[in-house]
Amino acid sequence: MFQLKSAYQPAGDQPKAIAQISEAFDQGKKKITLLGATGTGKTFTMANIIQKVQQPTLVISHNKTLAAQLATEFKAFFPDNAVHYFVSYFDYYQPESYLPSSGTYIEKEATINDEIEMYRLATMASLLSRKDVIVVASASSLYGLGQSRFFEENCLQLYVGKKYDFNDLKRQLLHMQYKPIHGKIEKGMFEMRGDILEIFSSTERCLYRCFFDEEFLERIEMRDAQSYELKAPVQKAMIRPATQYLQDVSDLETILQQMDAEKELRIKEFEKMGMSIEAERIKKKVEYDIRMIRETWFVNGIENYSLYFDQRLPGQPPNTIFDYFPEDFLMIIDESHMTIPQLRAMAQGDRARKNNLIRYGFRLPSAIDHRPLRFEELEAVLGWKPLDQVALDEAAADLELVSSAHQQVLATQTEKEQKSDSSLLNREARKSNQHAVLAQKVKKDAKSIFLSATPAEYELELSEQVVEQIIRPTGLLDPITFVYPKSGDYQLLLDSLPKLLQKKPQLSTFLEEEPEQSATLPNFEELFGDE
């Protein structure tokens, strides 16, 4: 699978660190901290570990820029394997929010980076089709995605020599959120011209030009998406969905009925509290959304109804990139002292914002469950803590926020459960409490490495072993540095002159950088003469 290619060999403390981490994994340890000084080549050490464990790998960094740098480095180390960049695809993002103090409603605004969206879709496609995958992600990986099973099942496979119905192809492409070409050609579009079907891939920089003889697929050409230059004729083409949030709409009417039922009960709840403005607000909002979803299978903000589309219970964790990984994968937390606090804070900020939207009638209470994975849930999924030791207090707090209207909808579904297998809760197929659902998501054989020059107390206590990497491959040492207060710095310089006079090059550099201050030093010429 993984084949590391590099002109360098491990040096300094790298061989020792690689051996110790590998041995720890062989002994069954799953949580390790690599305490590596700056400049010791921790990324190269991780590349060697990836080659040794031969498992799909997820690397999480605390910002996009560092993640991009790491992805570039890993691509250089593993040119023959799938290395992906998985970060937020927004160039600009203003979340939907409401400020009660000023009565200001801020509508969601976002500018999507098509290139990064393609990277994300390609990541999901690779994880479902191969094992030699390295994903470099940011903290946004905690946010929800479409169900991995549904994403995989809704791929269009085209084979030369097979018979296809054009109307069925068009219907399936539309369902996969591909759009007919109107004006500007972009990824995730398709065009039918006579007996030719062109599909602009959502996961690759190419288009597939399919030639039909009546209903038989005669030839497939893979072409460059910009120049249209022929890359190669192919015998088959795998077309992946054009969105990462593809929803199961096979029982759409039931989902819409559930949304409408929650809306009606929420209206009654507002009216009972004398909140007529909020009641009218939520009525108009949900009715418009239902109409759009029924007609187009989509509406802006559809993610706020993910509880219904995903058939989840309140408080249950969302589907994330972790669901696309197998049970035996390698997790690397880069700069863990910075990244872990970010992972911990993601859900808290999201919940505070949703609170106002729900209380003032801009969203249904079920919107609280469109959220990132909580840190406590992440601990359980990755096996950092046993499930019975994971605190899920915030999930209980969410249930307090969920209105009695929403709870009545859930109660109604409970009564219907014995009569229907397609209920919101789908009780026979899913567990009805958060612990049980988390248990289904736990990656029992996952391994975790925390990388940091200054690991925090959390990862040090969590780790079963701490490996040090101090000596650089170059053998260079850090210079001994003394830090003094700014006040009295020139007096300190004067007091240090006997030693500094023996190191004139360093002293002259200081004087060149600070000419005005150095000119005020007493007896300057007497001390230094003409030098």
Predicted regions, residues:
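ASCE RecA-like P-loop NTPase motor cores
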Residues: 1-531
